[in-house]
């Protein structure tokens, strides 16, 4: 039941992370959230007794403190990302998402939980599945994405985080199971409905839209609904708003 679930949320004040936090609390989930500034939490969220907010730079958090935050959690949800200004795109840390993914999964491995911990990563459609499984992406588009990763550090960071989950955690890890959620172009909106796909459903030239509310809803479903988790564990679903899915 949701009120028996404990989650560590990485990034709880961003546009998507804030929505994930609010939804988890609405469902009765106990949340430990690492945030850069607790002042950015919504008043109704900040005062919730089920929330423990820790102000910290996640990459600078001491190992022992991270272990204590992970200890006893059923899931770790990462909504970390880079700011969209020049400093956020090209400034340090360029490997925020990938390095924190490694740190969190490493902490789980040290703790050796009796049951695998769920790791839910907010990723992007610019991220490729391994071994060219995204067959809709042709050679030209793959080249464009590779160029993007070479020029724009957040694109490489997102790919590195997903590659770590696919290649190093894999499908048979004893302590971590994972899902990498790949939204298309993120937009505001109430998130009236969404569609999930195994692979890409649009091209870079004609992207679909994904409301941040829908991303938050699906990520929370993965945490609280065993059926959703069993369907998508170890996979990289693409999520788009239902009205624009193909």
Each model region followed by its residue ranges:
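Mid/C-terminal beta-alpha module of Rossmann-like enzyme folds, strongest
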Residues: 14-15, 203-246
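SDR active-site strand-loop-helix element
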Residues: 10, 34, 79-80, 119-125, ...
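NAD(P)H-binding glycine-rich loop region in Rossmannoid oxidoreductase-like domains
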Residues: 33, 39-103, 110
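N-terminal Rossmann NAD(P)H-binding glycine-rich loop of SDR-like oxidoreductase domains
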Residues: 2-27
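Glycine/proline-rich active-site loop of Rossmann-fold NAD(P)-dependent oxidoreductases
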Residues: 129-133, 190-195, 224-234
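Conserved beta-loop-beta element that borders a ligand/cofactor-binding pocket
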Residues: 162-188
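Conserved Rossmann-fold NAD(P)-dependent oxidoreductase catalytic core, especially the SDR/UDP-sugar
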Residues: 87, 91, 102-152
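Structural motif
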Residues: 6, 74-75, 118
